[in-house]
Amino acid sequence: MSFNGEKPKPIPESIKDPADMSVNRSNTTQARDILKQDEGGNMNMSLAEMEKHLKTLRLHGMIATLETRIVQANQGASFTEVFACLIQDELDYRKSRLTQTRLKASGLTEQPTLTEFDWGFNPKLPKMDIYELVSGKFIREGHDALLIGSPGTGKSMIAKTVANAAILAGYKVVYREAHTFFEDLFEATQLKRRKKISKLFSETDLLIIDDLFLRKKMPEQAADDLLEIILNRYSAKKSTLLTSNRLVEDWGKLLRDNTASSAILDRLLHHGHLLKFEGKSYRLKEAASRISQSKQKKQDEKGKNMDLSKEDL
């Protein structure tokens, strides 16, 4: 293995990606053999020693691909090519770990994408506006979004899709269903941790409150709690996305505080995107599909039983 500055041979396409390595022996065996051959030459450190030192330096991404990169070097890649690959491996590893950490911290339990969305079922949905939300442009601009419409029209799925896309883009996101949002604030107040949860809700890059007013009876402090967080986020130019099946004109009555409701909507709509969701319910569609499949299954089983009975005769 030589890193002496000679013109490197191109890395074969089949081994550029560690996942695509096509060799007769394992990378571990090859890497150890290569390093053993180099003893007394350019390299005096064993594979185990390299991994130990990389672990001390917490370069776990490099550890994961070290064996593959040694094989690549032996097959003609230059020092700079291999080292660049190792650096990129570490960066990719850290980005992946950070993304997983943020997904877990967000409260999001699923990762939907727009490729899963059935646009044909509800053709009246604001498709272009939805794509713009998922692009994250409104987060970069510090704007807000309200998704208003009938139950089952896709508001929650779009909200979760926006959350997932934002996390993958590197943003910190907090997703809460409305009742959980208010419960978190109430419990934190009782446990004297209000400041901590308020800071979390106020400072995250994107706060999503899903299904606001789904429950008819709102907590007594709902208006004050929501107003506090929205005012904090508005001042900090942090983006908030809310979904609800209730018209904004009804929010004052539902919150039992017209003044607070007006202040909340004033901030949300100042630089806000109001998307109306109209059409049929995706949930009812899925329920109808399940019922149909169940009926078909029963009919098929009944047919099989009849055939077996005829055979017995």
Question: Which residues make up each language-model segment?
Answer:
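Intrinsically disordered, low-complexity and often Lys/Arg-enriched segments
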Residues: M1-K52, K199, I291-L313
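Interdomain "pre-motor" coupling segment immediately N-terminal to P-loop NTPase/helicase cores
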Residues: K55-T56, H60-E110
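N-terminal pre-Walker A segment at the start of P-loop NTPase domains
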Residues: P112-V134
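Phosphate-binding P-loop
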Residues: V134-G142
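Residue-level preference for the first positions of well-ordered beta-strands
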Residues: D144-L146, L206, S239-L241
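Walker A/P-loop
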Residues: L147-Y171
